[in-house]
A protein has these predicted regions:
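Glycine-aromatic micro-motifs
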Residues: 2-140
Length: 140
């Protein structure tokens, strides 16, 4: 399956955008494509001044795998809303906390998806999230 049509990219989400989590509503209208895994390690970022709740950060280090849910977004406005949540500015990646990258996905109905990769300070990373699963690790 294609990662991206003219206006409908596939995203793989691993944290607060997952089903049952606090920001999942931003995916209303997106087509669910199933769960899978991406390579990397999921880290906890504790509550901070700019975000009043803890959240996960994906580091693409290839050392383990992270549980993701894949969705085909409804179009550019929905993707822009996700970018805002993730503090990603496609026109200024250097100033972005996360960057959106296309990566391989294992075990899902898609082979590749766009995922938000953390590029902020590693000093903000608290601890690895067990099993690379935000939901099973108690996140929300």
């Amino acid at each position: 399956m294609d990662v991206e049509g003219p206006t409908s990219p596939v995203v793989a989400v691993y944290g607060t955008l997952r089903r049952g989590c606090r920001n999942h509503g931003l995916l209303d209208g997106a087509e669910p494509l199933g769960a899978g895994f991406v390579d990397g390690t999921l880290w906890l970022v504790e509550t901070e001044e700019h975000r009043a709740y803890p959240y996960p950060a994906l580091i693409r280090d290839g050392s383990s795998r992270v549980v993701v849910e894949c969705y085909r977004v409804s179009g550019a406005p929905q993707l822009a809303a996700l970018d805002r949540l993730e503090s990603f500015d496609p026109d200024d990646e250097a100033a972005s906390e996360y960057v959106r990258r296309t990566v391989p996905v294992a075990g899902a109905s898609v082979d590749r998806a766009q995922v938000y990769v953390y590029r902020g300070s590693r000093d903000r990373l608290s601890r690895p999230i067990p099993g690379g699963d935000w939901v099973a690790g108690g996140g929300g």
